[in-house]
């Protein structure tokens, strides 16, 4: 994973050389993509942040293609490409515009379902992302509690049935990652069962 800032050092902007390094490491390790987060809303005007990120990403697209490593944008709570303090019926159009601006199959979405259940309907985001949706992050979220919770727990109000329907509609066949706390074999077995319930019903 790679943000548009150096991991662990939010005072330093990431440049194309950082992305190049991540692409090469992902390829060497047998990975299938590099995750990026497009800036922080507090860094300045969104348009300027987006343009800086776009310019750096464009420099490494030929390398991404040659290595077979897509650059995947994740939706996080970074006050970018959504309205952080507004109601939940928001759409993914700004993410789509950013991805489409590259006109490249090597830029897509790493859609975090739990992150933006607070802000929009997952079924609509998935349908609109369509082929752009390359990978998924899975975690539970409670709108009522305004907090992350265990996947498919009693408090998790993510509409997983609608998520499954939308993923089937777009023919999603990519990786899904449980972005939750780990643990021993028992804990990981529980997480696996939670993911199966979320994605298979």
Where are these regions (language model features)?
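Active-site region of glycoside hydrolase catalytic domains
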Residues: 66, 70, 98-101
């Amino acid at each position: 994973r790679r943000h548009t800032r150096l991991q662990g050092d939010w005072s330093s902007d990431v440049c194309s050389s950082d992305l190049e390094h991540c692409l090469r490491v992902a390829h060497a390790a047998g990975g299938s993509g590099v995750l990026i987060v497009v800036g922080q809303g507090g860094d300045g005007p969104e348009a300027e942040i987006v343009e800086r990120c776009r310019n750096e990403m464009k420099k490494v697209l030929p390398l991404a293609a040659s290595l077979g490593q897509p650059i995947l944008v994740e939706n996080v709570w970074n006050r970018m490409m959504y309205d952080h303090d507004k109601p939940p019926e928001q759409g993914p159009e700004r993410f789509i515009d950013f991805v489409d601006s590259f006109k490249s199959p090597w830029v897509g979405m790493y859609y975090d379902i739990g992150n933006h259940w607070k802000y929009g309907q997952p079924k609509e985001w998935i349908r609109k992302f369509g082929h752009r949706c390359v990978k998924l992050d899975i975690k539970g979220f409670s709108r009522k509690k305004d907090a992350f919770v265990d996947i498919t727990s009693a408090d998790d109000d993510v509409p997983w049935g609608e998520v499954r329907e939308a993923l089937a509609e777009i023919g999603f066949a990519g990786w899904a990652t449980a972005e939750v706390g780990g643990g021993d074999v028992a804990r990981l077995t529980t997480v696996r069962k939670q993911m199966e319930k979320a994605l298979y019903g």
